[in-house]
Amino acid sequence: LSLHDALPICRPTDLPALSRFGDEGIDLFLCDSTNAATPGVSGSEADIAPTLKRLVRDAKQRVIIASFASNVSRVQSAVDAAVAAGRKVAFNGRSMIRNMEIAERMGYLNAPRGTFVTMDEASKMAPHKVVLVTTGTQGEPMAALSRMARREHRQITVRDGDTIIFSSSLIPGNEEAVYGVINMLSQIGANVITNQDVKVHASGHGYAGELLFLYNAARPRNAMPRSD
């Protein structure tokens, strides 16, 4: 649970309400602990958006942004970057397409009319006119980005000079798969950008400083830390 109030689509965490519940007495507090060992506070989505805009603006050919399909705020930042650069956006990967259709229908994902195109349409467009937002951040063998890296994707062929942005974190245990995909993309000649190169990801899991703030507000009798 990140406490930042600068997310593109979310309401800020209602800390006064949590404090009121603490006054009344909380028997059990279940709280995210994924980044509990990381000191300080997590980065904000507002810090990521300008970087994505710059990377998309400076790219000469196709841009492919890999993100978690559940991270609608990040996808909105990617869409905003594409719009600012005069590019269309296509979603790639079953979960990404489904989630963004729902997000758009509910008003959580917004773009000027005509921004979104299908993958079939994107495959026929000039590379510098489109941004693909895709699944596959963890090197899943059947995910869209992995199939692109193996040159097995039905609609898109990654070419020398394309820009691939991993706007995600590396989940422990997936290193071999992710680096394998990165290596294949690099061998093609793509410009691969990860969070180790430039700040293109902010965790949605609060750091130790944010968790301390929450626990001080809630003051529970019992706590059950959990990790997603």
Q: Where are the predicted features?
A:
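C-terminal regulatory/interaction regions
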Residues: 80, 84, 103-109, 114-228
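His/Asp/Glu-rich metal-coordinating catalytic cores
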Residues: 1-124, 143-154, 176-179
